[in-house]
Amino acid sequence: MQKAAKDYELDESLIYAVIRTESGFNADAQSDAGACGIMQVMPSSFEWLQQVRDCEGKYTEDDLFNPEICIDYGSYLLKYFLDFYGTETSAIAAYNAGFVVSDWLDNSDYSTDGVTLTDIPYPETKEYVERVTDAKAKYIELYYS
């Protein structure tokens, strides 16, 4: 996690919080939706990220169960969303729900400025953002303060 945090200029506590929320640190986790590994990366996202990173076909879906690979790609995806959306809340929401976050930001019911989410219409994603945010705060309190 330290390597990924350094490589992608991410707060370690954010990576820990996503892992805690996604898999409870279970490298063999697989969701009913098909997300794999310690950071629960979707195989379709993994394929897309390999294309984005110019390493298409380097890894297979099974490689998502390798914690080092999954943390690298999951962290890269988090950084991608942070850069794309500009706020941690939107990035965390996108990690869970994908690019639909763009629609929410364009809707005045969910964002007053097109940048900051004031509400999240998917209950699962809303709870997910709260859980990750709470876990991050706890990690900061326990290990970084």
Put a short name on every predicted segment.
Residues 1-145:
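Catalytic glycan-binding domains that act on GlcNAc-containing polysaccharides
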